[in-house]
Amino acid sequence: MKKLKNKFNNSYLMINMIKNKINISSDNEIIEKNVYSLVGIDLIGNRDFLGFYIDKNNDNRFFLNLFETLKSKGINKIYYFIANDDGKLKRALNISYPSTIIITNLTMNIASLWYHISYRSRNDLISKLKKLYVQDNYDNAYILECCLKEDFNDNALVLLLLDKYFSNIEDYYQYDVDVRNFLFNHNSFTDFYDKIKSVSKERMFNDENDLYKEFNDYIEAMEKNRLYDKKKWSNILNHCSKYFPNLLEEVANIL
């Protein structure tokens, strides 16, 4: 089995935090806990699995300890951090990586709606929600948003959740469409979320090592396969450099 790296890259253009619930065996009891899986994309476009982190004790310092662990393993800069909306996480991230921009995790927000819509409607909903973030301009996105709400006009709870989790779409239209496509590449991470969710229904875990053994083959395959070819990655870097003036210089220093 491949071992998790002791040292990671100095900088990551993006780190995506994927939240799942798993069953933990503790003192002859089965306890449901949150596990956070971190996947990073470095400055040359390679993916790194950065570890499983189980919040075993609902500790107020959990996220702060997590970011301290990342720092101890060599990660000094994160440009974008993709995560669910959590006040404790945001505060800890601001302490450890104050210049990092936190972006709503589309996978997590979509998952919040799954229990309230039919199975057949899910793929259609995923497609429409992704499109909200990657239109050429916000006017087009607003039209799509209105159409989406009309689709669920008879489901008051879904409408409330759409307002709760997708009310800040306009904020992201400060970014170019290529950057938004990169930040909201939902499909690149939803497979990992679904895989953990599926396996967790069938078995318990004792700790992070158990998780790593279970998903080792998947992680190895994920790290080997790039999401973007070199030309596409260069375009992403060029667009992101508009918001981070020193980004291209940092990339040049490691090539």
Predicted regions located by residue number:
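RNase H-like nuclease fold core
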Residues: M1-Y80, S188-F189
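Basic, amphipathic alpha-helical segments enriched in Lys/Arg and hydrophobic/aromatic residues
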Residues: I196-L255
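Extended amphipathic alpha-helical interaction segments
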Residues: N94-D191, E202-F205, E223-L227
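Alpha-helical elements of the RecA-like P-loop NTPase motor core of helicases
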Residues: R61, G87-R91, L160
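A glycine-rich phosphate-binding loop feature that marks nucleotide/adenosyl-phosphate handling sites
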Residues: N84, L161-E170, K232-K242
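A short alpha->loop->secondary-structure connector
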Residues: D42, N46, L70-I75, R91-L106
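Switch/connector loops and helix/strand junctions flanking conserved nucleotide-binding motifs
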Residues: N23-S25, K88-A92, S112-W114
